């Protein structure tokens, strides 16, 4: 598969058009760092319609803007990279319309550094859902005709086990507590990526991480 075929298949012109007209319903599939299993490469894509140029920089290319330049289609800059692993760090080096160079993290990143570190991170994993029983139960239950009592919480301050918050570890205890207290639903404060723990998630820096 040559480069033009890669572009047509993994940065489809129709999807770019839908995004630019505000009609894309699955923009996260078009943008960001996505692993393309068929070609064993990661595709990077970022929307920067007014940029003069964009390049991918990361720990895999020495953070050198000259090594991985990106190409443009309809305001979206993209490139394909082989051999990356989960945890590789990256950013976009953008030359703006006025010639200023800025380094930006990926707004569609699936994984990000935290605290004072601001690089995006490559993610090649996947999650296998095993909630078939619950989904069937939910489909059969008329939530509009059932009592509802919602428990809102911030996971990091509800209980923090040694080593930090662990969703899998905290789930059984949280479910038991809410059941005993008579709650029917749990509402979690923001879980998207944010830089400052004290904000309880209200300073979002990445909706997909």
Walk through the language-model features, giving the residues of each.
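Ligand-site clamp/hinge motif
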Residues: 163-173
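The feature marks proteins involved in alpha-glucan
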Residues: 1-43, 71-152, 157-162
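Short amphipathic alpha-helices and their capping/turn segments at secondary-structure boundaries
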Residues: 138-140, 171-182
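Short proline/glycine-enriched turn/loop motifs at strand-loop junctions of beta-rich domains
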Residues: 47-54, 63, 85
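Short beta-strand elements bearing conserved aromatic residues within extracellular beta-rich modules
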Residues: 54-56, 90
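Aromatic-lined carbohydrate-binding/catalytic grooves of carbohydrate-active enzymes
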Residues: 165, 176-209
């Amino acid at each position: 598969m040559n480069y033009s075929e890669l572009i047509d298949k993994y940065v489809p012109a129709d999807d770019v058009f839908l995004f630019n007209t505000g009609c894309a319903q699955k923009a996260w599939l078009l943008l960001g760092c996505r692993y393309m299993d068929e070609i064993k490469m990661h595709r990077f894509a970022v929307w920067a319609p007014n940029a003069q140029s964009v390049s991918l920089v990361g720990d895999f290319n020495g953070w050198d803007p000259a090594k991985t330049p990106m190409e443009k289609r309809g305001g979206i800059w993209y490139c394909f990279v082989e051999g990356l692993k989960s945890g590789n760090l990256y950013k976009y080096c953008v030359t703006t319309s006025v010639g200023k160079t800025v380094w930006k993290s990926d707004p569609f990143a699936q994984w990000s550094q935290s605290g004072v570190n601001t690089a995006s991170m490559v993610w090649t994993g996947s999650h296998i859902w095993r909630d078939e029983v619950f989904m069937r139960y939910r489909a059969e239950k008329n939530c509009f005709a059932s009592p509802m009592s919602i428990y809102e919480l911030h996971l990091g301050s509800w209980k923090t086990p040694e080593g930090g918050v662990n969703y899998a570890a905290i789930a059984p205890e949280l479910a038991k507590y809410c059941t005993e207290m008579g709650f029917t639903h749990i509402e979690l404060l923001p879980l998207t990526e944010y830089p400052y723990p004290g904000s309880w998630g209200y300073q979002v820096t990445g909706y997909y991480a």
